[in-house]
A protein has these predicted regions:
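A structural feature that tracks compact, well-ordered secondary-structure segments
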Residues: 86-90, 99-100, 111-113
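N-terminal secretory signal peptides that target proteins for export/translocation
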Residues: 1-7
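Bacterial N-terminal signal peptides
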Residues: 8-18
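Electrostatic cytochrome c docking/interface patches
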Residues: 22-41, 53-56, 94
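Solvent-exposed, polar/charged alpha-helical surfaces in well-ordered, non-transmembrane soluble domains
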Residues: 34-38, 46, 83, 95, ...
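Peptidoglycan-targeting cell-wall enzymes and recognition modules
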Residues: 78-93
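Flexible coil segments in periplasmic/lumen-exposed cytochrome c-class electron-transfer proteins
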Residues: 42, 50-80, 111-167
Length: 167
């Protein structure tokens, strides 16, 4: 065999190996995105982070998912807003997201549940949200207790029905 044919064969084998590795990596990425979509769905992320999701029985186009909302959640902690995860995660590395997901948050964010996800689960959520791409605008900033709120908001304060309390 001539040197030219040997070099050509070696280059062809190297290219095929590279393409096979890319295909395997692509399958792994697709699996992570699918797993992340599943986790986002069953964990209820859309309930707060997708505008109109609860009110419409989950019938919101996926292109609108996880953009946050300008409707606040007010309680003794002040007023918080469900962030636009597509913008937040879009600015983070995977490692930054995993660390971010483990931190305590203000109510009503169930951070204690998110923090219990495995690293692989959090990486899958990251892959899914990144696959959606950046979209929307940043949500309003936190308002401390007693501060002026310029958006609609839900009040998270228990109300005691006095007719029931008297019984």
């Amino acid at each position: 065999m001539k040197l030219r044919e040997l070099v050509g064969a070696a280059v062809s084998v190297a290219l095929l190996c590279g393409m096979a590795a890319e295909a395997v990596a692509g399958d792994r990425d697709a699996d992570a995105v699918a797993r992340g979509r599943y986790l986002v769905t069953i964990s209820g992320c859309n309930d707060c982070h997708t505008d109109g999701y609860l009110q419409n029985g989950g019938k919101v186009p996926e292109t609108e998912w996880l953009k946050g909302t300008a409707v606040g959640y007010q309680g003794p902690w002040g007023t918080t807003y469900a962030s636009n995860l597509r913008l937040v995660i879009g600015k983070m590395s995977e490692a930054q997201w995993v660390a971010h997901a483990r931190k305590e948050r203000l109510p009503p964010m169930p951070w204690f549940n998110l923090a219990k996800m495995t690293d692989d689960d959090l990486k899958a959520v990251y892959a899914y949200v990144r696959s959606l791409g950046p979209a929307g605008v940043a949500t309003p900033a936190y308002v401390a207790p007693g501060g002026k709120v310029n958006t609609p908001y839900f009040v998270f304060v228990p109300v005691v029905d006095q007719t029931q309390a008297a019984r």
